[in-house]
Each structure stands twice: as structure tokens, then as C-alpha cells.
């Protein structure tokens, strides 16, 4: 492998508009229930009732922010390691792909991935996931999600170059700790972002949103 392609996400700029989700779903003609890119809202804190004014509540450490997440095209992908038929491979540019001609639909990769990236297509009987828009990448074009982000909160490029430009943060809540799979991701944290594994908040997105 000569390089490692990666995504960049600016949590301080994301407005939770889900344009990236829609672009991904449209470009890949994904069925209902399958979203290769998901926007997850995370929040916490408390609203404390005013003891003297009924109906009045005061915020206490209230926060919320959104994460746009897809397959992380990890440097140590557990999905590939778990596949019993060798149906998941990394290209020379680090992009992780599922060979659906080999896939037997056992779903081991789904259970192994801490990001929930591989998703089972019930009708086709095989696993699916983000391809980094490899077809567009090979033409020198942007992934659909990156191109669709109106806030320019998404970017892509070689991992080393993204780290040099944006820093080396690669995990904030609610994402898992990065040392599990070494995700090819760089994040500019939201001002209220919490370190993975130490969060006091919870995912507040509705299931149908993800």
C-alpha cells in the first residue's frame, strides 16, 4: 500500500443538515434502511426546574453536536480480518472494499466493525458499505458526500496530508476509541466535543434518522 486515503470531518462546522447522507444514498441507489453515511447527534447536560417559577427551566452544562460518519477505511480493519472467505480487501490507496461476488452474507464483518459500517442488504443477501466512491476517486473526483456538504465540513485526501493540515484527532464521542482499528479519519472537534470513552452524553438522534 503506497498511501492511505482518509476522510476529514469538521464537527465545529456541521449543522446536521444530512446533505451528505442524502447524496450518498442517491449516488449509490441505496434501499430503505441502509445508510452508508450517517449523521449522528450527540448531546448531554441537564435542564433544572426553577423552584420559584413553574414552567421555567435552566440549562446546566447542556451541549449537542453532530458527527458525520461512514466507513473509516481503517488501517487495521476488523471487518476484513473477520471475513471467512476473504471478501473484504484494502486497495493500494487504502480504500476498503467488499467483493459481493465472494460475500456469503454471514454478517461477521457487521459484528466486528465498531463503527457499524458494513450493512446487510436483505434483498441481495450480501453485505454493503461505503466504497469511498472509488469509481469517482479513480477519475480524480470527490466522494459524493464531500461534494454535497454545504458547510464544507467534509474533506478527503491522503491521511498524512490531512493530519498535517488539520491535526491528528481521530476520535470523539460517540465514536469508539481509535486504537481499536486505526481509522483513516481526521476531526476538528466541536467546542463541546468529549473524548471517546469518557463521554457524559448520549446519542439523541432518532433511530429513523440513522
Feature annotation, model-predicted:
Residues 1-210:
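Non-ligating segments of multi-cofactor redox enzymes
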Amino acid at each position: 500500500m503506497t498511501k492511505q486515503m482518509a476522510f476529514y470531518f469538521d464537527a465545529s462546522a456541521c449543522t446536521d443538515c444530512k446533505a451528505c447522507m442524502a447524496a450518498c444514498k442517491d449516488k449509490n441507489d441505496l434501499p430503505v434502511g441502509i445508510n452508508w453515511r450517517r449523521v449522528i447527534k450527540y448531546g448531554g447536560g441537564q435542564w433544572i426546574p426553577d423552584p420559584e417559577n413553574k414552567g421555567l427551566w435552566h440549562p446546566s452544562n447542556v451541549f449537542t453536536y453532530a458527527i458525520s460518519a461512514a466507513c473509516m477505511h481503517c488501517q487495521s480493519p476488523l471487518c476484513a480480518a473477520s471475513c471467512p472467505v476473504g471478501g473484504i480487501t484494502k486497495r493500494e490507496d487504502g480504500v476498503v472494499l467488499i467483493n459481493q461476488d465472494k460475500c456469503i452474507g454471514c454478517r461477521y464483518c457487521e459484528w466486528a466493525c465498531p463503527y457499524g459500517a458494513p450493512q446487510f442488504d436483505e434483498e441481495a443477501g450480501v453485505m454493503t458499505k461505503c466504497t469511498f466512491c472509488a469509481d469517482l476517486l479513480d477519475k480524480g473526483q470527490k466522494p459524493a458526500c464531500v461534494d454535497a456538504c454545504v458547510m464544507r465540513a467534509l474533506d478527503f485526501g491522503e491521511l498524512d496530508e490531512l493530519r498535517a493540515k488539520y491535526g491528528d484527532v481521530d476520535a470523539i464521542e460517540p465514536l469508539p476509541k481509535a486504537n481499536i482499528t486505526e481509522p483513516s479519519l481526521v476531526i476538528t472537534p466541536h467546542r463541546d466535543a468529549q473524548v471517546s470513552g469518557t463521554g457524559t452524553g448520549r446519542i439523541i438522534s432518532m433511530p429513523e434518522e440513522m
